[in-house]
């Protein structure tokens, strides 16, 4: 286990770089995420786990969770990176300066962030997530990321995904497979059907 606290959060300085060479798993804590109240404040792009590359680990995950789990984890990391790139373009060009499709990609990455990566440690249910629940939520989010949606303006995109994220958050606070959980899941399915371009 290696722990580094680089000055100014600079992850490129020599001690951090050398620690990363020997560490199998690296959590990059980020002040910006903490300031935005996105907890745990772990940067999903700079963080990594080399265990995903180990055949023994891959075999265990395939047998205990799903054969497609690691592929989905890698996919959402790629989507997070694409979302960050688009966020930077929006900051430079403005909301009207990028196509509506870019806003959809950005908000799909926000969906991943809010639903899969963020966690409320003060909530008894959200603080501890069983593997079966993780698999269900990951599959649900990945399915939405694969779906095509129809929007005319970036405001429609933002309002739609904020509504979706809110329902997901309520699911995160509900006991897995409870009536309340199923109710929110049904609401999500109805919301997806409203805009999905089939």
Language-model segments: which ranges?
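P-loop NTPase catalytic core
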Residues: 1-169, 177-180, 185
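C-terminal accessory/interaction regions of large nucleic acid-associated machines
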Residues: 187-198
């Amino acid at each position: 286990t290696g722990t580094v606290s680089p000055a100014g959060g600079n992850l490129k300085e020599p001690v951090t770089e050398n620690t990363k060479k020997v560490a199998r798993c690296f959590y990059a804590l980020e002040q910006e995420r903490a300031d935005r109240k996105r907890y745990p404040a772990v940067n999903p792009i700079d963080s990594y786990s080399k265990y995903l590359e180990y055949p023994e680990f891959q075999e265990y995950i395939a047998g205990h969770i799903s054969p497609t789990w690691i592929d989905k984890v890698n996919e959402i990391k790629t989507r997070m990176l694409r979302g960050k790139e688009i966020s930077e373009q929006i900051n430079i060009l403005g909301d009207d300066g990028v196509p509506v499709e870019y806003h959809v990609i950005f908000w799909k990455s926000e969906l991943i962030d809010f639903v899969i990566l963020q966690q409320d440690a003060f909530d008894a249910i959200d603080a501890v997530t069983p593997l079966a629940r993780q698999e269900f939520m990951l599959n649900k989010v990945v399915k939405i990321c694969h779906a095509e949606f129809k929007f005319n303006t970036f405001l429609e995109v933002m309002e739609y995904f904020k509504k979706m994220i809110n329902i997901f958050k309520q699911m995160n606070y509900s006991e897995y497979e409870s009536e309340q959980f199923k109710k929110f899941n049904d609401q999500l399915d109805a919301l997806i059907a409203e805009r999905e371009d089939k």
